[in-house]
A protein has these predicted regions:
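Structural signature of FAD isoalloxazine-binding scaffolds in flavoprotein oxidoreductases
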Residues: 175-178
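Conserved A3 ("GATE") glycine/threonine-rich loop of ANL adenylate-forming enzymes
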Residues: 32, 132, 156-159, 186
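Acidic/polar, solvent-exposed loop segments in beta-strand-rich repeat domains
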Residues: 99-101
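Short beta-strand segments
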Residues: 28, 85-89, 127, 151-157, ...
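ATP-binding/phosphotransfer module of carbohydrate and carboxylate kinases, centering on a glycine-rich
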Residues: 1-83, 93-96, 113-124, 136-146, ...
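Generic beta-strand structural signal
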Residues: 122, 147-152, 156-160, 164, ...
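Active-site nucleophile and cofactor-binding loops and adjacent substrate-binding regions
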Residues: 103-105, 109, 125-131, 151-154, ...
């Protein structure tokens, strides 16, 4: 069994006055780790437990690790659960509860819901992890005041999820939407999916760093070299924006080009779905106004019909790495 780490947040109230509150487990299943949290119906995480995602084992073994996380949290908190939700990467059949395909775990046609339900004797639900994160923000985070939203996460890739009127838009196959793989530049940079010119290849944090490294080669006097101690491998998104704040021209050019591409992709999403809000997640968003202000300006210039016809707010997601736990728990509400 995988090694477990647990954390109880602010204790739990086991008195009779708390018996009316309902509790749910949310599991965030990733390629390297599994996180499980108990969330109450008011959106408070009362406990979290996690373990590594084991390599080279069958799917049923990983599902057993998930079940053990839930069981251990129940023992530690003394709480009764109403249900369990799971956010899993890949193509999910939400009706049957099967993981049709997950490249990160090398899973095909895994009956996740059936197997987990047998071990926990609780209602179990599963959905795509990016969708689940969007649902978490909708219920408990920056999306609470909106009826419709699209969440775009800028990380290693570009993740996305859509919520309309409290319901996930999952598409015909249950895989959610892959907005990161809309093409914004024909014949452009090769994407991990095999196509060229994908949004992800230009707007992910990975893309920002790649663009900055390339620009550094053309300017040996750039402040970026000093900030990375002469080693480009130390570069990250924060350093790029730090250099921008210090007036570095190379960083300025990189961020301008990056926000141009990001704005193009975000505008495409707005023109296609007309949500009330675009939620942006990922570490890049910590750059604040130096990143968001030019992005919003560029998007507003491009929206079909203008902002008066289709006003959309662009805001930063607020739940961070816990969005998956919140959203997974919300599947069981």
């Amino acid at each position: 069994m995988a090694q477990l780490q647990s954390e109880i947040k602010n204790g739990t109230d086991k008195s009779s006055s708390a018996t009316a509150v309902k509790y749910y487990a949310g599991i965030d299943l990733g390629g390297t780790g599994i996180k499980c949290g108990i969330v109450d119906e008011n959106g408070k995480i009362v406990a979290i437990k996690k373990c590594p995602t084991r390599k080279g084992v069958e799917a049923k073994e990983i599902i057993s690790d998930m079940a053990n996380l839930v069981k251990d949290l129940q023992k530690e908190t003394g709480l009764t659960l109403e249900g369990v939700g799971v956010g899993c990467p890949g193509l999910i059949d939400t009706e049957k509860g099967n993981v049709v395909f997950c490249c990160n775990l090398a899973w095909r046609n895994v009956p996740l819901v059936k197997t987990l339900k047998e071990q926990l004797n609780l209602p179990v639900f599963v959905a795509n992890d990016a969708n689940v994160a969007a649902l978490g923000e909708y219920h408990f985070g920056a999306g609470k005041k909106y009826k419709s939203l699209v969440m775009i996460t800028l990380g290693t890739g570009v993740g996305s999820g859509i919520v309309f009127n409290g319901k996930l838009f999952e598409g015909n196959l249950g895989a959610g939407v892959e907005l990161g793989h809309e093409v914004i530049k024909i014949g452009g940079e090769k994407c991990t999916c095999g196509r060229k010119g994908c949004f992800e290849a230009y707007a992910s944090a990975t893309a920002l760093i790649r663009q900055a490294k390339k620009a550094m080669d053309g300017d040996k006097e750039s402040l970026l070299w000093k900030l990375v101690d002469g080693d480009k491998e130390n570069l990250n998104g924060k350093i790029v924006f730090d250099a921008l704040r210090e007036g570095d021209k190379t960083a300025e050019k990189v961020v301008k080009k990056y926000t141009d591409y990001l704005a193009a992709g975000v505008t495409n999403v707005i023109n296609a779905f007309h949500p009330q809000a675009i939620l942006l997640g990922g570490g890049i968003c910590a750059a604040g106004d130096v990143f968001l202000t030019p992005l919003k300006r560029k998007v507003n210039r491009q929206i079909y019909g203008g902002t008066k016809f289709a006003p959309v707010e662009i805001v930063v997601a607020s739940l961070g790495n816990d969005a998956g736990i919140y959203g997974a728990a919300a599947l069981a509400f």
